[in-house]
């Protein structure tokens, strides 16, 4: 048995912070998948023992794929699924051709974890419904559920783990991504630097806006509440941002920017 699949990054068309609850921030966001040259390729096959290969920047225990697999196994045990199915997950060789950077606001680790959970559910005929997969995904990381969903465009609420499909003409082939070299944004550090000025009360209106309208009527600072704190924590990022044209927007907590492909700007 060998299965291979591709996973793609996301960008946040908008990301608005509502308020802080405990250690984390409640937010609303529109996530869009971007299908281009930037992608990870994951292969899964049977092996004598578990093996995870890839150009990762963290210890195994912190790897999102490893975490997703452990949480999935515990969930299946709680459902009292066949022991042979759970045992087969212990003898997988997973190899990742890693191209999507982490700490870039593109869902680098969550992309792989969400894709793996979605495909393992199909490969092993686990028959988990979307809500069950979301329960697992939310324990892996906030962005994971967007990648489990396989939606091309979705609203994310709560801490980013509550996903709802947003019906619109997909932008997946109309966006291009720019990732600055050697700038890595810690999500935790950027959120810690965030200082709310006023409470945000327009969540419902924003969640109804088509993504294209957002990009055509708002600037990057207005669309993403994390841009300013990211620039405060990274002088090199601030230098780059100051040289970018208005057509560039900021994704997540950074460091990546994105825009509508210039050749297609006037197509609608």
Swiss-Prot record:
GO term, biological process aspect, one: isopentenyl diphosphate biosynthetic process, methylerythritol 4-phosphate pathway
UniProt KW Metal-binding keyword: no
InterPro entries: GHMP_kinase_C_sf (IPR036554), GHMP_kinase_N_dom (IPR006204), IspE (IPR004424), Ribosomal_Su5_D2-typ_SF (IPR020568), Ribsml_uS5_D2-typ_fold_subgr (IPR014721)
Reactions it catalyzes: 4-CDP-2-C-methyl-D-erythritol + ATP = 4-CDP-2-C-methyl-D-erythritol 2-phosphate + ADP + H(+)
Keywords: ATP-binding, Isoprene biosynthesis, Kinase, Nucleotide-binding, Transferase
Pathway(s) where this gene product acts: Isoprenoid biosynthesis; isopentenyl diphosphate biosynthesis via DXP pathway; isopentenyl diphosphate from 1-deoxy-D-xylulose 5-phosphate: step 3/6
E.C. numbers: 2.7.1.148
Positions with a binding annotation for ATP: 101-111
Catalytic residues in the record: 10, 143
HAMAP family cross-referenced by the UniProt entry: IspE
Function: Catalyzes the phosphorylation of the position 2 hydroxy group of 4-diphosphocytidyl-2C-methyl-D-erythritol.
Protein name, per record: 4-diphosphocytidyl-2-C-methyl-D-erythritol kinase
Source organism: Helicobacter acinonychis (strain Sheeba)
């Amino acid at each position: 048995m060998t299965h291979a699949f591709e996973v793609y990054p996301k960008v946040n068309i908008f990301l608005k912070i509502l308020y802080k609850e405990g250690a984390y921030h409640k937010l609303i966001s529109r996530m869009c998948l971007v299908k281009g040259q930037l992608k990870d390729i994951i292969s899964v096959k049977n092996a004598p023992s578990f093996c995870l290969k890839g150009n990762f920047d963290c210890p195994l225990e912190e790897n999102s794929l490893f975490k997703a697999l452990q949480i999935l196994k515990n969930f299946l045990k709680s459902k009292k699924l066949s022991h042979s199915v759970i045992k087969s997950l212990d003898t997988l060789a997973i190899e990742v051709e890693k191209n999507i950077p982490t700490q870039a606001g593109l869902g680098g680790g969550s992309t792989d974890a969400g894709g793996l959970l979605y495909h393992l559910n199909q490969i092993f005929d686990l028959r988990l419904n979307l809500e069950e997969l979301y329960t697992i995904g939310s324990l892996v990381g906030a962005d994971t559920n967007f990648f489990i969903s396989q939606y091309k465009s979705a609203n994310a609420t709560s801490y980013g783990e509550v996903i709802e499909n947003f019906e619109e003409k997909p932008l997946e082939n109309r966006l291009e991504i720019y990732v600055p070299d050697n700038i890595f944004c810690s999500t935790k550090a950027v959120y810690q630097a965030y200082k709310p000025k006023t409470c945000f009360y327009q969540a419902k209106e924003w969640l109804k806006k088509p993504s294209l309208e957002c990009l055509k009527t708002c600037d990057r600072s207005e669309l993403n509440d994390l841009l300013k704190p990211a620039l405060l924590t990274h002088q090199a990022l601030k230098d780059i941002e100051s040289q970018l044209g208005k057509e560039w927007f900021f994704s997540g907590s950074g460091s990546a920017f994105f825009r509508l492909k210039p050749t297609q700007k006037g197509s609608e």
